[in-house]
């Protein structure tokens, strides 16, 4: 498992659990740092988790607007929390990072296949595909 994959999975866990607990991402990240710093190696992996979570937190309005613009007959609040967390991470990476677009989409689809509902991976692939074509 690549360092970036592990970082994306850790960021997904953090975003999802923070939403489920009604916790701010800043507080969740502080708790994560205390709990996970020794487990994540190399240090660049831990830094990428921080970058993702801070990036999503700082740009959540723009991220959510991009996602919402590509939802057909859905609202962001109606999405499963798992799908919402995966999309927020992927959209942040697509719009605000230097990560390769194909890798971002593939990782998001892999997370959706592992943690999402039956159709989550196709749904997420469609939303991200539309965002990539637009950008």
Functional labels for PLM-detected ranges:
Residues 1-121, 125-135:
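N-terminal interaction/assembly modules
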């Amino acid at each position: 498992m690549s360092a970036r994959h592990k970082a994306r999975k850790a960021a997904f866990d953090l975003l999802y659990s923070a939403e489920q607990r009604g916790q701010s991402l800043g507080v969740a990240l502080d708790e994560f740092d205390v709990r996970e710093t020794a487990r994540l190696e190399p240090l660049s992996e831990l830094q990428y988790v921080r970058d993702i979570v801070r990036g999503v937190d700082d740009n959540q309005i723009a991220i959510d607007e991009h996602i919402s613009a590509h939802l057909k007959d859905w609202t962001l609040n109606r999405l499963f929390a798992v799908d919402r967390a995966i999309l927020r991470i992927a959209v942040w990476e697509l719009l605000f990072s230097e990560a390769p677009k194909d890798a971002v989409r593939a990782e998001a689809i892999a997370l959706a296949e592992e943690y999402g509902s039956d159709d989550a991976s196709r749904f997420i692939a469609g939303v991200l595909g539309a965002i990539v074509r637009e950008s």
